[in-house]
Amino acid sequence: MERLLIVNADDFGLSKGQNYGIIEACRNGIVTSTTALVNGQAIDHAVQLSRDEPSLAIGMHFVLTMGKPLTAMPGLTRDGVLGKWIWQLAEEDALPLEEITQELVSQYLRFIELFGRKPTHLDSHHHVHMFPQIFPIVARFAAEQGIALRADRQMAFDLPVNLRTTQGFSSAFYGEEISESLFLQVLDDAGHRGDRSLEVMCHPAFIDNTIRQSAYCFPRLTELDVLTSASLKGAIAQRGYRLGSYRDV
């Protein structure tokens, strides 16, 4: 039985090096999908590059942990900037959910303004949409808009009946031990679970000054090498996977 594999590169719009890496991994590798940060410093560059790559499916990378929000978020920002203190607020059950809802709508409308179409799907920077307080908001919004959502089904959330998502999701292709064998192990693990559709998250990039400031820096370049490996596409096909995007879900 043929299974669907979505290889999604996060962080489109983060920097020019990130953008170029994603485009390279699409043109000469196995990346089929990406998600864009509409408040990223290189989002206009990402939009420009995407016009020459119509096969690349583009979703929205909802941002609540970096940069400036599009709306006033006094309950989540410090000095007007978003940050990782969102985890502390979540633990204290003090998230400003109405502000988050308004920001989600604003980022979605900004995406359409930038790219001229709806995103293929939604996910989020640092997986914040999987917070128990935030997931119902994002899942309901995705279902209402008729777009798909990255969802880790191993987390016990109720999904709206009309929400499109993959059966499996993996963030395991990440870290200091990136290799082709690791990527294929992710596929084999999904096969053993019986997943008929799978999204694998990745972050291929060329290194620039912005990426050098990231805690996750040089592995992005290693990811790019693996994802453009001449042998990987054949190994994927041998395992019964067809490369696709959330358009196919």
Curated annotation (Swiss-Prot):
Mg(2+) binds at residues 61, 125. It holds the Pfam family YdjC. GO terms for biological process: chitin catabolic process; diacetylchitobiose catabolic process; polysaccharide catabolic process. Its EC number is 3.5.1.105. GO terms for molecular function: chitin disaccharide deacetylase activity; deacetylase activity; diacetylchitobiose deacetylase activity; metal ion binding. Pathway: Glycan degradation; chitin degradation. Induction: By N,N'-diacetylchitobiose. Its main location: cytoplasm. Disruption phenotype: Cells lacking this gene are unable to grow on chitobiose and chitotriose. ChbG is essential for growth on the acetylated chitooligosaccharides chitobiose and chitotriose but is dispensable for growth on cellobiose and chitosan dimer, the deacetylated form of chitobiose. Deacetylation of chitobiose-6-P and chitotriose-6-P is necessary for both the activation of the chb promoter by the regulatory protein ChbR and the hydrolysis of phosphorylated beta-glucosides by the phospho-beta-glucosidase ChbF. Catalyzes the removal of only one acetyl group from chitobiose-6-P to yield monoacetylchitobiose-6-P, the inducer of ChbR and the substrate of ChbF. This is Chitooligosaccharide deacetylase ChbG. Keywords: Carbohydrate metabolism, Chitin degradation, Cytoplasm, Hydrolase, Magnesium, Metal-binding, Polysaccharide degradation. It is found in: Cytoplasm. InterPro entries: COD_ChbG_bac, Glyco_hydro/deAcase_b/a-brl, YdjC-like. Belongs to the YdjC deacetylase family. ChbG subfamily. GO terms for cellular component: cytoplasm.
